[in-house]
């Protein structure tokens, strides 16, 4: 059976990485509080790059040295699409997984969406935390505002951006279409990739399983729910 796994933040929680919508994702600019969904936008990157980069560094880059957990190692030989940008599936040895939302350890030139650009490693260790904002702006080659094809942008799909070939969307769609079963692990079903997968599952009559302690109930009859963590699931699946 061709089983496709689609994972979300719940899988990396065991590695000490907070879920995206957790309390530490909120950010204050002046007297105004911003949600993670407001911070993680192309508009914020363009209009307030110093705040965007400081938030991104605090929210993601500070966790860059965390290691994989048992679930990542269990998934290392599986057909996998992850929504997580932490790169832990690669560290666990999965050489063929798709990081559909990008990677924390990578960046690209700031470009018009859809244009081909090179993905390069982000030298996070060069950041001087004693002068954090200035150092981040230097790293991403931003003066007052990002400049197309001159400044750099973290390789992450933001909420007001769309999937392109840079994020392997064509290959991801192919894997969904070819699956006999799709197993969702630790995801809240609040992003487009899970909606896309469910549309394909319903169209092709694909079996679906959901692994989550408090799962989102899907409008589809062929779903088996495992009300448990991903770690608990792999322990009973071995």
Model feature map: region roles:
Residues 1-238:
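Conserved catalytic core of sirtuin-type NAD+-dependent deacylases
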